[in-house]
A protein has these predicted regions:
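Mg2+-dependent phosphoryl-transfer enzymes with acidic/Ser/Thr/Gly-rich catalytic loops
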Residues: 115-178, 219, 223-227
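C-terminal transmembrane helices and immediately adjacent loops/tails
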Residues: 156-379
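Amphipathic alpha-helical transducer elements in NTP-driven molecular machines
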Residues: 14-18, 39, 70, 93-94, ...
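Residue-level signature of catalytic and energy-coupling elements of molecular machines
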Residues: 1, 24, 37, 42, ...
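Cytosolic catalytic headpieces and adjacent flexible linkers of membrane translocases
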Residues: 1-99, 103, 117, 123, ...
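Charge-patterned, long linear interaction tracts outside catalytic cores
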Residues: 98-117, 125, 200, 213
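Flexible loop/turn segments at secondary-structure boundaries
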Residues: 13, 39-41, 92-94, 116-117, ...
């Protein structure tokens, strides 16, 4: 026998996988290899993509899984950070998924073959391959990867987190502003003051200047550390106590500032019952102040833990555009004679505009101080 040569074959992982795995680790997402390959082969691939880093990761074979009860497997998964499942059959995949679910995990399973269909169905999120996957696996899955790329899963996780964050930002902005309006009206009644905001002006705020920034917050880009936070508890509500307290105290602050400034202008112009000029000045000032405060509040709402200076004011051009349009609308309402007659507003001097802008910025300063001193405490 004459030795001619030795040939080896290798199916390397895609180039984007190591970076995607690193992102999942930072995001607190556990990744397991479940394969029919030989254990050391699976370990070598896992090391190559960064799924394991310890010297001796736990390798569980299909034969071992046969001897494990679901409870024991759940404990093994809990007590071992790095596990590789090798030489497994489709039935074993179902057992692994059940054990992970028993530990309270939300399980996403990838697969491309007919034999992966039961596991894809059992998982919370079944992910099939769009190119290499079979029709059966695609029908059994919840999501199909059009490019068969693991990196796309990570992108989907990031997009999901962005959507959830933006929903909270929208709720926070809307609730804090509406509470501010309620406090303004309620406080004025309790203090025996005339109405600072007429029904028409409230509608102008809620249906005019308030709407565009709220919509723009829905297309906010993700925060810098969005993929460095652990997954949230699936049972966690959007309106948790700290979140409610946060927008409630800001709403009270908004109401207090607007009511206080309304009272200040009434006194400044020596308001008495029937003094229409003094009332119009005070009401217009309160309205414009409320609009400007809400614009600052929209800037604050972009992040509950990061300074607006760190995020950058112009990274969301939609929001900046919405704020400019809202301010322009408010300016027209106060300064155009035709609209003054309809809305019950009056002209403000340059000094009054500057004073209002300065007063409105207090909410921005307050939130910047909170973020610096109590980062994320009320998020």
């Amino acid at each position: 026998m004459i030795f001619i040569g030795l040939m080896g074959m290798m199916d390397p992982p895609r180039q984007e996988v190591p970076q995607a795995v690193e992102l999942t680790h930072k995001a607190g997402v556990k990744t397991y290899i479940i394969t029919g390959d030989y254990g050391p082969t699976a370990e070598a691939i896992a090391r190559q993509v960064g799924m394991v880093s310890s010297k001796n990761p736990r390798i569980i074979t299909g034969a071992e899984l046969e001897t494990f009860s679901e409870i024991r497997l759940s404990k093994v998964i809990k007590t071992n950070e790095e596990i590789i499942f090798s030489r497994v059959s489709p039935e074993h995949k179902l057992k692994i998924i059940s054990a992970l679910k028993k530990n309270g995990e939300i399980v996403a399973m990838t697969g491309d073959g007919v034999n992966d269909a039961p596991a894809l169905k059992r998982a919370d999120i079944g992910i099939a391959m769009g190119i290499a996957g079979t029709d059966v696996s695609r029908e059994a899955s919840n999501m199909v990867l059009a490019d068969d790329s693991y990196g796309t899963i990570v992108t989907a996780i990031e997009e999901g987190r962005k959507i959830y964050q933006n929903l909270r930002k929208f709720v926070f902005y809307t609730f804090s502003c509406n509470i501010g309006e309620l406090i303004t009206i309620f406080a004025s009644i309790m203090l025996g003051l005339p109405a600072p905001l007429t029904a028409v002006l409230i509608l102008c705020v809620d249906l005019g200047t308030d709407v565009l920034p709220a919509i723009a917050l829905g297309v906010e880009t993700g925060e810098p550390d969005i993929m460095e936070k652990p997954p949230r508890n699936p049972k966690e509500r959007i309106l948790k106590k700290s979140f409610i307290f946060h927008f409630a105290y800001l709403g009270i602050f908004i109401g207090s500032i607007v009511t206080g400034y309304f009272y200040f202008v009434l006194k400044q112009y020596n308001y008495t019952e029937g003094n229409e000029e003094a009332y119009l000045k005070a009401a217009t000032s309160a309205f414009i102040l409320l609009v400007f405060i809400q614009m600052w509040s929209a800037v604050n709402s972009r992040s509950f833990s990061h300074s607006a200076f760190k995020i950058g004011f112009f990274k969301n051009p939609h929001l900046m555009g919405a704020i400019l349009i809202s301010i322009l609308i408010a300016f027209c309402m106060a300064e155009i004679p035709y609209l003054q007659e309809i809305l019950g507003t009056t002209h403000l001097t340059a000094k009054e505009w500057i004073t209002i802008i300065a007063a409105s910025s207090t909410i921005f300063i307050l939130e910047e101080l909170r973020k610096a001193l109590f980062k994320g405490k009320l998020a």
